[in-house]
Amino acid sequence: MLRPLRDQILRISGYTVDSTLSVSEAMSMFAAKPYDLILIDVEGEHGIPEAEQLCSSVKTERNEQLVAFVCNWRVAILTDCPDDIVRTEFDPAAFVAGVKKILDKN
């Protein structure tokens, strides 16, 4: 339920967003066009292995691709694949600021 809301918040903030729940569809989308940033929503500790696999696949294909996990603080300390972490926020401005910070520093 939060993913569509986050997508819309990013769109309203001026970002172009492509979104999917499917790892295979995500890889197809990634192969079809370049992205400034790929956000992988990690839902709890149980989602880490799938998120890390997707991150690894993306980095294998294009090492320079920016990848960030959207997750809570606990998940953030359990993984090291992504370039950065955007903390799960109920504050839309903080979420957008996290995305902007990643893009600005790269």
Which role fits each region the language model picked out?
Residues 1-18:
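Two-component/phosphorelay signaling modules centered on CheY-like receiver
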Residues 19-37, 45:
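Acidic, metal-coordinating helix/loop segments flanking the phosphotransfer/catalytic sites
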Residues 39-60:
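Conserved phosphotransfer microenvironments
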Residues 41, 66-72:
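Short beta-strand elements of ligand-binding domains
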Residues 71-106:
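Output/docking surface of receiver
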